[in-house]
């Protein structure tokens, strides 16, 4: 399970520590916290210029599992290397060589390196979306929208075609669209009729009636 959650401030201007409190509560309840990813928003929402603190440009993404036996396909989320060569004495050597002149190199994977837990420029360069820019959809007016490319690696890395993806806060339908575009099904819950309509519009009537359930 991937959980994207931001923080908020109390009346004193202190962070409520919502993400940290929630993650601790879930671990206490039996969930296994695999990663705490940091989503760096390249186009963060502008803040009041009168605030007496730094502006916020990130949210936490928690990766939870319920057991030690879970599906994860690293090859779907690898990040291509920036160069075909790595530096090392006594001379430069190809990254796909295991040994060169007695010096051990990293055992580089042909599909790329393991992604980092800081998501910003990385997500632009994954093997899934080399040519796509990491920017939010500004045409959708929703308080908690996120880019399709943010969640695409999560879906492809932790599910296979034909699996059903659950989004209990469907919103504008980003999860549903990415799921459908990549051969998955989707079940979503949304209390706002406006955003249910938006989800239908984004996914297409034929696709959503067959492969998406909105409740």
Q: Residue locations for each model-derived region?
A:
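Core catalytic lobe of class I
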Residues: 1-203
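S-adenosyl-L-methionine
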Residues: 200-215
């Amino acid at each position: 399970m991937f959980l994207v959650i931001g923080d908020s401030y109390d009346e004193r201007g202190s962070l409520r520590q919502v993400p940290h409190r929630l993650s601790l509560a879930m671990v206490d309840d039996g969930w296994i916290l695999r990663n705490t990813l940091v989503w760096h928003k390249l186009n963060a929402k502008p803040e009041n210029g009168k605030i007496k603190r730094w502006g916020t440009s990130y949210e936490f993404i928690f990766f939870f599992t319920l057991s030690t036996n879970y599906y994860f396909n690293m090859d779907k989320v690898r990040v291509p290397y920036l160069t075909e060569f790595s530096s090392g004495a006594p001379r430069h050597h190809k990254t796909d060589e295991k040994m060169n002149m007695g010096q051990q190199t990293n055992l580089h994977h042909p599909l790329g390196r393991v992604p980092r837990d800081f998501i910003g420029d990385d997500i632009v360069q994954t093997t899934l979306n080399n040519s796509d820019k990491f920017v939010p959809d500004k045409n959708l007016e929703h308080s908690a929208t996120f880019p399709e490319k943010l969640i695409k690696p999560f879906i492809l890395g932790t599910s296979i075609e034909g699996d059903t993806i659950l989004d209990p806060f469907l919103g504008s339908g980003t999860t549903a669209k990415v799921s459908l575009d990549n051969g998955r099904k989707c079940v979503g819950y949304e209390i706002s009729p406006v955003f249910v309509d938006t989800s239908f519009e984004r996914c297409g009537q034929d696709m959503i009636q067959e492969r998406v359930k909105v409740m």
